[in-house]
């Protein structure tokens, strides 16, 4: 892609972003990101979060999902969040900055979880996008596979998994893998998710024993 084309594409994205009604609402409400609204819509339909829960948030920055979850789980609940990028503190959120793919970071994250299992693992991770699906989709699938591995390690029986996935090669196989681990699996496309985006959200509940 030429610099001229890239510049035009970037300009269109910025124009679309700042005119987006969810971006405007997020700014008015003092929210970290428009992702807050995606999670709110999913919570209204699927009721994933309840007071006192422990939740793992992978790909947490800038904190839209963590910010939402603390309003649902209350003071006795706990969010353990991780991201490669920095994130401003949120009351009720234990944040670890580091690359989730790094074994030392994963070990530190598991230590924060401790011996008790968690009730929800959620993943909004995405790689740096090149704009080429043949490159971006495999990178994304690798990240969500790691998130599913995290579920196997820390998610309690009956627990839930929420993950953003980009549709493309490997999606159907990944969906089958999730269905083998959970009793109920749904695919959501929240209104706050841009229509042209390949992203969907898999909501898996009832972690099998």
Swiss-Prot record:
Gene3D superfamilies from the UniProt entry: Vaccinia Virus protein VP39
Superkingdom of origin organism: Bacteria
Gene Ontology CC terms: cytoplasm
Similarity field: Belongs to the class I-like SAM-binding methyltransferase superfamily. RNA methyltransferase RlmE family.
Functional summary from the UniProt entry: Specifically methylates the uridine in position 2552 of 23S rRNA at the 2'-O position of the ribose in the fully assembled 50S ribosomal subunit.
PANTHER family tied to this protein: RIBOSOMAL RNA METHYLTRANSFERASE (PTHR10920), RRNA METHYLTRANSFERASE 2, MITOCHONDRIAL (PTHR10920:SF18)
Name of the protein in question: Ribosomal RNA large subunit methyltransferase E
Organism from which the protein derives: Yersinia enterocolitica serotype O:8 / biotype 1B (strain NCTC 13174 / 8081)
